[in-house]
Amino acid sequence: MLVVSSVDLYPGSQEERLPGFTPQFPHLVSCSILDRYPQHTVPWHWHRSVELFYIKSGALIYYTPGGQRLFRAGSGGLVNSNVLHRTRAVETGAESIQYVHLFEPELVTGVSGGVIEQRYVAPLLKARGLELIGLSPEDPVQAETLALLRESYALDETDFGYELELQAVLCRIWAGLARQVQAQLGQTPPAVETASEKIKPMMLYIHAHLAEKLSVEQLAAAVFCSEREYYRTFRACLHTTPGEYIRNVRLQTACKLLRETELAVTEVARRCGLGSSSYFGAQFRQEFGCTPTEYRLKWQNSDIGWQENDSGIPAARGTIMA
């Protein structure tokens, strides 16, 4: 199982890049250590793939344009296709560890245009308001779906027949989810553009022009809306202001460049639109409690390999500072 502590996005986009994802078998399983992400947060992003997840330990909050939901250890759920979302670890005294399946809906539809797709898959993908489906261990029916979810993560990827066994259990999980939300299936989105659809080009423009000085007047004009509508869309979808979103994106991008490149701190600051190295350093210290140089050294000096402990949970052989 791939162990991750950062999210990889396509350049100039908030769409997640999925390493190892192939048309022959469009699936990726991973273990996400939320406490080791910058700000203990997976930033806003989306993917066409469906996201099935299980909280192994700790707790985290899923944010979508429709709101937020807390998931504790033993719970799980599904993020629907193309839904904008982010996650943040919650302090519980235990490390926040999440197991994730990312897969294309075709993995469970079978024949294109067939009964399974038309009756169970497409209606769920298109259902109005189904951004996020939660699974609670306290609900007996949902607990059965959670048991299947745990079973899916226990499968050995090296075993002959793994793909067949995984597909079979994913289909059973999907059946459980479809029954759970059956009353909402068949509700299609309205023809008018929703706030969730409006926010994506706004985000894309910010990422494409991150190194520049950005004003709401400029940003609103770029997507042909009023400043008032621009603020309202950010509040409705991301639950924050444009300015705070830009600041967080710049700091997240700076962390990535410090970890993955040898660029000078001044160049990192320039590429992220964070001004002079002194201003960048002050903003970085305020957010992370260390300077950009200290962050880079702590990261580079960390042993970021992983091993599994006796309980089967990935454990760090060193400490990753974030």
Across the structure, where does each feature detected by a protein language model lie?
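Generic protein-terminus/edge-of-domain signal
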Residues: 1-76, 82-86, 118, 129, ...
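Residue-level marker of regulatory loop/turn positions in helix-turn-helix DNA-binding domains and
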Residues: 31, 44, 191-195, 208, ...
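Short histidine-centered beta-strand/loop micro-motifs
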Residues: 40-46, 88-90, 111-113, 162-164
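Structural motif
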Residues: 76, 96-98, 209
